[in-house]
Amino acid sequence: MKGFFAGLICLLTLLQPKPVNAQTDSACRFRISVLTCSPGDDLYSLFGHNALRIIDTIKRTDIIYNWGTFDFYDPDFYPKFVRGKLLYSLEPQILPGFLQEYQEEGRSVMEQVLDLSCEEKMEIKKAVDINMIGDNRFYKYDFLLDNCTTRIRDILQKNIKGINEPVPLVPAGTTFRDMIHAYLDQGSQPWSKLGIDILLGSKIDRPVTNTEAMFLPDFLMKGIDSAKVNGNSTVITKQLILDAKPRVEMQGIYKPLMIIGIICLVLFLISFLKTPAIITVIKFTDTLLVLVTGLIGLLILFMWFFTDHWSCDNNYNIAWALPTNFIAAFATWKRPQWIRKYFKVAVVLMGLLLITWFWIPQEMNIAIAPFCLYMFYRYIELSRSKKI
């Protein structure tokens, strides 16, 4: 009997779980990879996308963790979007559903399978699981500092031990604006580029760090490719799981600089023709342009002071898009004495902007230059007597 109990105790001892080893074995069942989706043709998809893929080889699950979803049917969607208060969320997806959208749009998806220790796999899975709990799924989206790419970047940096800084991903001195411009140029979006340059202020004209450069999906992929742990690559395999259709380059000739330049040149030349019809046209365009610049200035002020978009702060475009022009426009046609004094101040401000164009701490879109030159000339004329 004693032998029976001794054997039973021995058997139960052997069957006792080994917490550390079991935990390690459990963690090793995960296969973790980063998916990088190529840029699309539309502005919202122009910069690409990232997601995290976790395969559980024991439970046989294959989950895509996507930090790029939002509720388009929220009744306050547009006000929240404009004011920078829109919440994005982490959503789990299955691979076929995730790939379907990119397949329909002809975009590629690249997978980098990460070389991780069992402990690192466990910590990354734990971090994702915590992100999936309740309100943790939601975050206030920031295109430059907190997006679907930076969320993955931060999880990897926090949970991969001894990971080295990747090689320089961009040339020294590259700014956020430079990186945005590269994609807008590649995607043939000159008018979007103009609009973005008008709305985004000088805060995005500082050089980015290597970590900050990984706010864009392609640069996160490059960063992962070049990062090392104890001298070894962080990537086991890199494979194309969805091929892209060749992109058709849309090189339109109607670029903002050319269009704005031609319009301003024509207006400048015809302003010397003193026929009644031309005088009426010039007075109308003066009123219209002063009104439009005033509206743009009010929009700049709103984005600067009444939204959470930090990238719209300190916007030097307000030097030519004077918010007060919105009021001045209604007095431009008849030009009373006070409005002529107002335009003298506008002449000084526009002149200072043109003189310091290449030295102010904000890169101005070159397409604005001919417009500013023309408005400088018109402000001079409007500051004089009523005669054109």
Tell me the role of every PLM-derived stretch.
Residues 1-24, 387-388:
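Bacterial Sec-dependent N-terminal signal peptides
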Residues 28-106:
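Glycine-rich catalytic cores of cysteine/serine-nucleophile enzymes that process amide/ester linkages
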Residues 49, 62, 111-113, 149, ...:
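Extracellular structured ligand-interaction cores
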Residues 71-146, 150-160:
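A cross-kingdom signal targeting lumenal/periplasmic-facing segments of multi-pass membrane
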Residues 130-330, 337-340, 348-388:
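Activation targets extended, charge/polar-rich intrinsically disordered C-terminal tails
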